[in-house]
Regions:
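Composition-driven recognition of glycine/serine/threonine/acidic- and proline-rich low-complexity segments
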Residues: 2-267
Length: 267
């Protein structure tokens, strides 16, 4: 008669080997801080960003994203470089600036995910246009025109990418993603293919190239193309779960021409 064996304890599942998938960024932040500001992010469906200014560092933002503010905060114009190019493209030629002390709240008119990106001196990040919510005045702002993959998807002239850089001082930029936002940290040489409407930000160290797959069937021949953006590390890539395809800048230019003020008051 065989001797009974003690029951074996269940083994923990093995962790998958190889590159890790993108991870979900926090959807709510009870309290965060950066030089000159404190902030919190609340809400699930349409989150709200609350920023408290100590009076030393202003924040700048697009004029249509303010939800409420304390009356003592002063509002002014935040000058930007390349105003003429932005005007021609149908983009706003200035942003709004708030100075404290006091509190101000921001929100976009769409469901999504609001999150911060902190930048240390020497760091810079590129962001798809119309996904920037607010930034501290310690950051330098610029923009570039994205071509290549943009030419195939958004018209012959491409679209703009916002650039935020911490030149001398630490700063933070808050972004709005559609759906939820995941982050992938790429090792040097590591790659990930992302649907063109799915990326929201990337470190400047990350290279982005178009990747096109021709789809064919045995009966009908060509069945179209499947296009991705291929990102190559090192660095971070932000991915939003709800695809957002920008209108072409040609359409933006036509909208600007239909207004007597050009792109001055466009989103």
């Amino acid at each position: 008669m065989s001797t009974p064996q003690p029951p074996q304890s269940p083994q923990s599942p093995q962790q998958p080997q190889g590159p890790q998938p993108p991870f979900l960024l926090p959807t709510q932040i009870p309290e965060g801080q950066a030089p000159g500001v404190r902030y919190r992010i609340q809400g699930e469906l349409v989150p709200v960003l609350h920023i408290w200014l100590d009076g030393q560092v202003p924040v700048f933002f697009e004029h249509h994203v303010v939800l409420w503010k304390n009356p003592q905060l002063t509002i002014g114009i935040h000058q930007m470089k390349g105003a003429f190019k932005r005007l021609v493209a149908g983009m706003p030629i200035y942003m709004t600036e708030a100075r404290g002390p006091g509190e101000i709240a921001f929100s976009r008119d769409g469901a999504g995910h609001v999150f911060p990106i902190h930048l240390q001196p020497g760091q810079a990040i590129e962001v798809r246009e119309h996904q920037f919510l607010a930034a501290t005045g310690t950051l330098d702002y610029g923009f570039t025109r994205q071509k290549g993959i943009a030419n195939m998807l958004f018209g012959s002239t491409g679209f703009f990418v916002d650039r935020f850089a911490a030149l001398q001082y630490e700063g933070v930029v808050w972004l709005h993603g559609y759906g939820n936002v995941f982050e992938k940290i790429l090792a040097p040489g590591e790659q990930i293919d992302v649907e063109p409407g799915g990326w929201i930000y990337r470190d400047e160290s990350v290279r982005m190239d178009p990747t096109v797959y021709g789809l064919k069937t045995g009966i009908f021949g060509g069945a179209g193309q499947l296009v991705f953006n291929r990102f190559t590390g090192p660095g971070r890539v932000g991915i939003q779960s709800m695809y957002y395809h920008l209108p072409s800048s040609e359409e933006g230019g036509q909208q600007a021409q239909s207004s007597p003020f050009g792109g001055l008051f466009n989103n």
